[in-house]
Amino acid sequence: MKIDYLHIRSGFKNVQDLEIDFDNRQLLTVLIGRNGSGKSNVIEALVRIFRALDLGDEPAPFSYKLSYSLGSSSDRRIEVDASPEYGSTPIQQHKIQVSTLGESGQYSLPESISLSKVTRDKEGNSDYLPKHLFAYYSGPSDRLEDLFKPH
């Protein structure tokens, strides 16, 4: 998986209206900033986003837009536009579109899919989520551990 774009629109902790357009030519991204600037909160926000997509029964944690690619050659692009304001159920709150990379090197027109199609099946498989999500926090805190427990 490669995250291409993240826009946290509504406030998540101290992160407000933050846009990150990740360099799609690099596989590594480094977040650098002063203490208290929100680096760890960005990582936690991503964990909360993928947790909601993975479980499928949680409301959108905040308003955001996320674009990421899956596959060894980034052959699928998934775009998620989510907000608690879009409706009262998790399915209404998540607008998801998928594009497929064609032989010409161009992505197809996006196809809308439901959150229920993204969520993992009983065997833990999903065509629209990464197989693994890893996060590391180097502080004396279990803030991320609690988010991973249901998985």
Predicted segment positions?
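P-loop NTPase switch/coupling surface
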Residues: 1-151
